[in-house]
């Protein structure tokens, strides 16, 4: 909480809720969420806390409306819930452009990238991490993903149904990338979690549909 003259203004708490499974939510995050008066987040993040009888606001494409809502509720305890960790491709950067650092508190969470590398039993300090969410995916494949895969021993991609692993693998193969392994973590930490390992050449033939996944591309 910060003080402005005689007013006391609550900090906006930006909280990483982890990959989605409740067992992967940090206790410090759980405590902050329970103490909050208002929860703000995407549908998937808010659904984790349906049992909490609190005011909830969904983050949609109109981000300026969310910023206005936060400004209107500066005197309340507001928790902004983001998937994974706030420091990795989240709503945090947008908030920092519209609010001062002193108005924001960040509570970390486990990223699905961390979970994917744990499932693969690999370290990831040398990995290149790229998000395809909300990007021009075809352009990203050509200009960012392909060079990274060619140059780096480990690449992690955050992707979804619009750019499934099969399509990524087919594109890379067409660019002459072949001697790589793809590991696909789908719905990580949820009961329906799947983790698939295949050569890049095998992936386009996979019949599974992947909904919300992390793709690791490593040397064979």
Where do the model's predicted regions map?
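Class I SAM-dependent methyltransferase SAM-binding "motif I" and its flanking Rossmann-like core
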Residues: 87-152, 206, 210
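Short, surface-exposed amphipathic charged segments that create phosphate/polyanion-binding patches used
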Residues: 71-77, 119-122, 141-147, 194-202
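Class I S-adenosyl-L-methionine
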Residues: 2-107, 114-115
């Amino acid at each position: 909480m910060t003080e402005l003259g005689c007013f006391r203004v609550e900090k906006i708490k930006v909280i990483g809720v982890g990959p989605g499974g409740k067992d992967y939510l940090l206790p410090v995050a759980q405590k902050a969420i329970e103490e909050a008066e208002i929860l703000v987040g995407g549908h998937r993040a808010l659904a984790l806390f349906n049992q909490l009888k609190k005011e909830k606001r969904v983050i949609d494409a109109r981000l300026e409306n969310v910023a206005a809502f936060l400004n209107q509720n500066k005197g309340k305890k507001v928790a902004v819930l983001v998937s994974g960790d706030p420091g990795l491709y989240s709503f945090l950067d947008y908030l920092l452009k519209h609010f001062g650092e002193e108005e924001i508190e960040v509570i970390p969470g486990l990223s699905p990238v961390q979970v994917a590398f744990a499932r693969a039993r690999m370290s990831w300090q040398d990995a290149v991490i790229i998000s395809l969410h909300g990007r021009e995916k075809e352009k990203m494949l050509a200009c960012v993903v392909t060079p990274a895969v060619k140059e780096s021993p480990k690449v992690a991609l955050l992707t979804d149904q619009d750019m499934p692993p099969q399509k990524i693998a087919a594109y890379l193969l067409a660019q002459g990338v072949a001697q790589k392994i793809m590991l696909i973590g789908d719905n990580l930490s949820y009961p329906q979690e799947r983790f698939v390992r295949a050569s890049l050449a095998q992936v386009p033939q996979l019949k599974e549909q992947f909904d919300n996944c992390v793709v690791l591309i490593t040397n064979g």
